[in-house]
């Protein structure tokens, strides 16, 4: 099975930061990868375009994907509100890992995070479904606008996104 490539064009307070490219592991977690891919393209009538990274903690991760409430309490999947944890085969082994944010077991929606460090304590709790393949320097830039509380000093927006 193919591993789809998707992208985010990121901005900080309206200033272009650049593009990150991510490879989705549809070969391991097809349902989770398809959800993220379709939210990147917006083909279901909703998705990530125009949404923000609402929580950025340096040395940990950058979280986004709440395109309904924009504060970390919302979002929805292409399957309805929430969907089950597909599997925990892939691990949080390096910076750039793409994983699902959740509110407990089987509560995946649209929120995701990009690791900026090894986060092995999340293994078995969050579904890893891909990794950044280009633009880790852009993620480092985003990380620099974060804080220990997760509040960002600049508004980090997904200005455009899609599939390559």
Swiss-Prot record:
In alphabetical order, the GO MF annotations are: cyclosporin A binding; peptidyl-prolyl cis-trans isomerase activity
The family annotation for this protein states: Belongs to the cyclophilin-type PPIase family. PPIase A subfamily.
Query: Which Pfam families did the record assign?
Result: Pro_isomerase
EC number in record: 5.2.1.8
Please tell me the species this chain comes from. Answer: Hemicentrotus pulcherrimus
Cite the entry's keywords alphabetically. Answer: Cytoplasm, Isomerase, Rotamase
Q: What is this protein called?
A: Peptidyl-prolyl cis-trans isomerase
Q: What class of enzyme is it?
A: isomerase
Activity regulation description:
Binds cyclosporin A (CsA). CsA mediates some of its effects via an inhibitory action on PPIase.
Q: Name one GO biological process term.
A: protein folding
Q: Domain PPIase cyclophilin-type spans what residues?
A: 7-163
**What catalytic reaction does the record list?**
[protein]-peptidylproline (omega=180) = [protein]-peptidylproline (omega=0)
Q: Where, per UniProt, does this protein localize?
A: Cytoplasm
Organism's domain of life? Eukaryota
Cellular component (GO) terms are: cytoplasm
Q: What does this protein do?
A: PPIases accelerate the folding of proteins. It catalyzes the cis-trans isomerization of proline imidic peptide bonds in oligopeptides.
**What SUPFAM superfamilies does this protein map onto?**
Cyclophilin-like
